[in-house]
């Protein structure tokens, strides 16, 4: 990627030295991500430009070592709905390294047109993707396309602690579409998809699932889907089409009417003692942390540890509160109207209402928040 600086004869001064430019351009490349790309020293990615640089480095790799470079996200990234070329566009150019989102979110992913292997990642083989949330949309019509919010194709891969908030529409013939992964092929080594969830609505022509569209050798467990799943043949809330010996385990989906044991109501998803407890599966090191209201879905759902900001476009944090000490607010709340906080006031008044805006500390400037205040005891857990 280059950027034009000058298009005329100019004399510049940079770092104490003069540069003479004759009717040309000064070009440059985005700042490289820090790190060396090894597992012990992964590239540190904090901006959309650096993520694009990382993608291009993988997609233009000349050797297998270059496709297995490793990276971590150090901040949430906004792709601004610019057309995205997936990382690892085909099986022959697959990404084979380890990518750790560190709990961050890549927002406003946009993929359209005739992309055959679609997702933030197109094809991943023999590596790992961890602790990553992706939000955006994919809308393609190409035949025999594979698509997932995280990856279109995953072979001998580990995908864990990942979430997709992507809306996916893949309507070409013989598409394989999933909330997390589109297609897991037959392989001597198993692909692992665990502790993941999908919120986005998924539409495919066939082989369409809330977690995986087509699964031949993947082990899928401790996952859930609350998105609407529609398509032709082999459509399911968890896995569209799969081998009998690879059925998902301890996975759940949203339904207020189904009698399937995997179907759970909105109330059960919001209850810490039901779906959240099932997903934890008795593990002390479980990534599942709490139940939080997710604006994208419009209901309260289990989320990962430290994922409070992932589902709010403005970075706000909405979640149930565990009360361990007194709660204070700066001023009274006007029920059904605006909540007004005055500058210079210190939070010093105990409140006993439910579902309130809570402040701790001193307000530095006047702010007015418009919100409907309602009583709902579920939002404060004693």
Question: Where in the sequence are the language-model features?
Answer:
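Surface-exposed repetitive/solenoidal architectures
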Residues: 12-324, 330
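Intrinsic low-complexity, disordered N-terminal segments enriched in polar/charged/small residues
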Residues: 346, 360-362, 374-377
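Short, intrinsically disordered C-terminal tails of secreted or membrane-associated proteins
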Residues: 366-381
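Short, low-complexity N-terminal tether/leader segments at secretion or assembly junctions of large
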Residues: 2-14
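Cationic, low-complexity basic patches in intrinsically disordered or flexible, solvent-exposed regions
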Residues: 9-12, 320-321, 326-327, 333, ...
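Short alpha-helix boundary/capping segments
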Residues: 349-352
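Residue-identity detector for glycine
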Residues: 16, 315-316, 336, 344, ...
């Amino acid at each position: 990627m280059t950027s034009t600086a000058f298009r005329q004869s100019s004399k510049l001064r940079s770092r104490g030295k003069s540069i003479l430019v004759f009717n040309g351009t000064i070009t440059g490349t985005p700042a490289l991500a820090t790190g060396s790309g090894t597992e012990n020293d992964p590239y540190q990615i904090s901006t959309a430009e650096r993520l694009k640089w990382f993608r291009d480095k993988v997609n233009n790799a000349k050797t297998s070592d270059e496709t297995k470079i490793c990276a971590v996200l150090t901040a949430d990234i906004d792709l601004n709905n610019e057309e995205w070329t997936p990382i690892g566009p085909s099986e022959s150019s697959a990404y084979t390294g380890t990518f750790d989102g560190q709990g961050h979110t890549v927002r406003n992913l946009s993929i359209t047109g005739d992309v055959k292997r679609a997702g933030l990642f197109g094809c991943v083989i023999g590596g790992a993707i961890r602790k990553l949330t992706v939000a955006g949309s994919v809308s393609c019509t190409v035949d025999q396309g594979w698509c997932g919010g995280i990856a279109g194709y995953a072979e001998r891969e580990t995908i864990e602690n990942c979430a997709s908030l992507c809306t996916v529409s893949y309507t070409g013939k013989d598409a394989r579409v999933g909330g997390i992964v589109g297609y897991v092929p037959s392989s001597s080594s198993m692909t692992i998809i665990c502790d993941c969830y999908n919120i986005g609505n998924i539409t495919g022509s066939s082989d369409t699932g809330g977690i995986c569209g087509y699964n031949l050798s993947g082990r899928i467990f401790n996952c859930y889907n609350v998105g609407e799943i529609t398509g032709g043949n082999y459509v399911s809330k968890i896995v569209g089409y799969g081998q009998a010996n690879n059925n998902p385990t301890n996975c759940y989906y949203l339904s207020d009417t189904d009698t399937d044991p995997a179907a759970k109501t909105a109330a059960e998803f919001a209850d810490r003692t039901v779906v959240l407890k099932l997903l934890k599966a008795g593990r002390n090191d479980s990534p599942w942390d709490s139940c939080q209201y997710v604006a994208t879905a419009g209901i309260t759902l289990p989320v990962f540890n430290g994922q409070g900001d992932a589902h709010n476009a403005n970075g706000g944090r909405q979640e149930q509160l565990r009360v361990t000490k007194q709660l204070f607010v700066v001023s009274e709340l006007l029920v059904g109207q605006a909540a007004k906080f005055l500058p210079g006031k210190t939070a010093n008044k105990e409140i006993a209402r439910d579902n309130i805006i809570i402040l701790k500390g001193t307000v530095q400037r006047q702010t007015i928040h418009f919100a409907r205040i309602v009583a709902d005891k579920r939002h404060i857990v004693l």
